[in-house]
A protein has these predicted regions:
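Outer-membrane beta-barrel "beta-signal"
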Residues: 125, 150-162
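Sec-dependent N-terminal signal peptides
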Residues: 4-16
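Gram-negative (and chloroplast) outer-membrane scaffold detector with strong preference
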Residues: 39-119, 123-138, 142-144
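Extracytoplasmic electrostatic interaction patches
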Residues: 145-149
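Sec/Tat signal peptide C-region and signal peptidase I cleavage site
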Residues: 16-22
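Transmembrane beta-strand segments of Gram-negative outer membrane beta-barrel proteins
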Residues: 22-31
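Short polar catalytic/cofactor-binding loops
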Residues: 31-37
Length: 162
């Protein structure tokens, strides 16, 4: 058991020392995920090319099912939502390839056409993804964001790092 803990500690230490060679900032178009159907996100590291970072964005979603981020009584008609997803994340990996682990919250306004009364809502999610990001230029991510509403949010992003 001690050997397993020692090996795990060494592996985490090595990953941490070789992590986050990605550029400090990027702007991404996110399809699906915590942005709803589509959104724009800004991602940055807290300090230089540090492994800890954050992401914030603005998204739009459309739904005619039970996948709204807040419960809507009646379930008549379709729902439109405008959301602001915010996230803290950590990058593992080196060079241009990274494993992203994060957690965040999505805050927003939802209007169900059958109810027509805007509702404020939130949802909390995790983020598990692969990120390809050059120091300057093309950035790409693919992953999923499991959340409290038991909805599986796969997503893909395309963007530009600078």
């Amino acid at each position: 058991m001690k050997r397993i803990l020692l090996l795990f500690s060494i592996a985490v230490s090595l990953l941490s020392t070789h992590s986050a060679k990605a550029q400090t900032r990027s702007v991404n178009l996110e399809l699906l995920g915590s942005s709803g159907m589509a959104g724009v996100n800004y991602d940055a590291r807290f300090k230089g090319n540090y492994v800890f970072g954050y992401s914030a964005g603005l998204g739009y979603g459309y739904s005619n099912s039970n996948f709204d981020f807040v419960e809507t009584p009646g379930r008549d008609g379709v729902s439109h939502q405008v959301v602001v997803p915010v996230e803290l994340n950590y990058l593992f990996g080196k060079n241009n390839n990274h494993l992203v682990l994060g957690a965040g919250a999505m805050l927003g306004v939802l209007v169900n056409e059958g109810v027509m009364k805007p509702r404020l809502g939130y949802n909390v999610f995790a983020d598990i993804a692969y990120r390809y990001q050059k120091p300057s230029g093309f950035a790409f991510s693919i992953g999923f964001k499991p959340n409290l509403r038991e909805v599986f949010w796969p997503y893909i992003t395309f963007g530009y790092s600078f």
